[in-house]
């Protein structure tokens, strides 16, 4: 699936569903962050397309890596908004949000931070993460869950990993995935390989798949990769609260044994858009704030991107 075709299809379906927006007489301006993974790029490109083509905005876009630095840039007003934050991998949301995260009318979490960043509503995309192997490898080796990986680690080993298996890991350090620590805590004798970008990790996995080699891949859902390649999750253990302790660097990685997934205590990621409070408090941007609050993707299935439903904003 090519990204440009995906964005075009999503934009077309969105416009057909949305109806008409009021267009501003003079262009209003916002500054958006370009995400460093495919899903975030798609979410923001669709938002930017609607804001510009239907609502009269001019949007400046800047490539900005995920992580605490992005949140700080938004709080400082250097950027106005960013799209599709995954709370399992955001360590600044607890510090900077001061409002409820609501999904389907239910409060998922009440944030008690300083309010220096605004939660602009959920995207509708519910994410999850796991480690995945090709179905052909799972069938051949009899791997059912993560507990079976060590028995077959030699099949996943490389010259670089020696006697350990290799995980094509979470690609970007700023995403706070902490794969190696998680592998070690679970007793999985694999070495996490951080390749720097989503594109590099996917290219590595695609090449191994085409060669019909076993490989273990960190990946999140929804993701287009699952629409092209038959993969099986190893069912990493669900998160469980551990006497107030969470699997974070701040408390030296305290854990409940196998119950430390994902990193900050979310069994599902209710993804959200976020922005600068002063920007979206301005009357001239009230329509943009309403747009983000109503913008919703829908997960048709757990592995692929979907259509958008957006109420008309008047």
Per-segment meaning from a language model:
Residues 306-312:
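Conserved small/polar residues in nucleotide/adenosyl-binding loops
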Residues 67-132:
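N-terminal segment of the mature folded domain
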Residues 105-167:
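A conserved helix-loop-strand patch within extracytoplasmic ligand-binding domains
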Residues 27-39, 59-62, 164-168:
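Short, well-ordered beta-strand elements
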Residues 71-86, 166-245:
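Ligand-binding pocket segment of bilobal, Venus flytrap-like solute-binding proteins
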Residues 16-24:
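C-terminal segment of classical bacterial N-terminal signal peptides
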